[in-house]
């Protein structure tokens, strides 16, 4: 019997595993991952941005964890020899309406304690000669990294401290009892843990349902499609270039990202995926589609964002529409500059009343902790999210009437934060 089993080998699961074994070095800990390697889904299919925390409601978990995670991610990379580029982010306004929205973002960045600089049109042009706009906000702390590399380093640390990673282990059933949790996999494996931690991303709601519980949310998969610019445009921008987001839209808009390998990507958009892990336009699951369209919450989201959703779908099917979104602030680009690049799928939790759950969300039972909503900036925030989960583990252990083996914490969660922010 394990003391802890963690489900999910993305960056949240690996961060949690690494920090949990640091706090409880004598614990028997296993991480189950359904793929043959870590970071195969959301972690390995995002833009790699180290976010600063510009957009998030002051005081929210997203705002707190993103600010802490920005520093912790860079510190972790420094400590483990992982390359990153602290290139900064430029938010660009291209109309009077966007200038008004940019002023609101300026106030929010102040409330979130983020260093930033206001630029007029001339100053913007001086910093970014190929970008057109009425003004911008420069955020120097934003950067770029390979979160696959970060996750791989976390996995190596976890294993070096005695943790066990079991790949090709897709969870098919959970049974919680008074002394622990039994975990069954499609491959025929059976594991038992005193405490279970689920960091299951696109499958988060299904793991809660396996316990016989109604999760109170459903995961809606949104595919984010990217292009890569032709190599001759690798120097077209000096920073990450973001449009000013439309408050009516749930996502940040199509942006230009300087990748860690020197290439520049365009994207992502946000298109409803008809399969939980539907990375290609043609990917379709009848059961997943029935589940999506059978959800009153998702139907309300689609109704509330009908116009923008149809626009996203049109631009997904028509490359010229996608291009126009980028040409608003980078008119130099043409259709031939947009080359194919792998898509990602976002796991967005939706409430029954049709609200996109805006903050990170965790659900606990006497023996389990579930990470239920961890969209962007979860990768940036992975280290503080992991520490937050470890704190929840400590609370759970203290409340258990029969906690199993006595585990002594070798260090506090506060010490974890300090270690990653030296």
UniProtKB/Swiss-Prot annotation:
GO terms for cellular component: cytoplasm; plasma membrane. Signal peptide: none annotated. Induction: Expression is induced by RpoS during carbon starvation and at stationary phase. Is also regulated by cAMP-CRP. Repressed by CsiR. Makes part of the operon glaH-lhgD-gabDTP. It comes from the Bacteria. InterPro entries: FAD-dep_OxRdtase (IPR006076), FAD/NAD-bd_sf (IPR036188), L2HG_DH_bact (IPR030862). The keyword Cell cycle does not apply. Its EC number is 1.1.5.13. It catalyses: (S)-2-hydroxyglutarate + a quinone = a quinol + 2-oxoglutarate. It holds the Pfam family DAO. This is L-2-hydroxyglutarate dehydrogenase. The lineage of its organism: Bacteria, Pseudomonadati, Pseudomonadota, Gammaproteobacteria, Enterobacterales. The gene is lhgD.
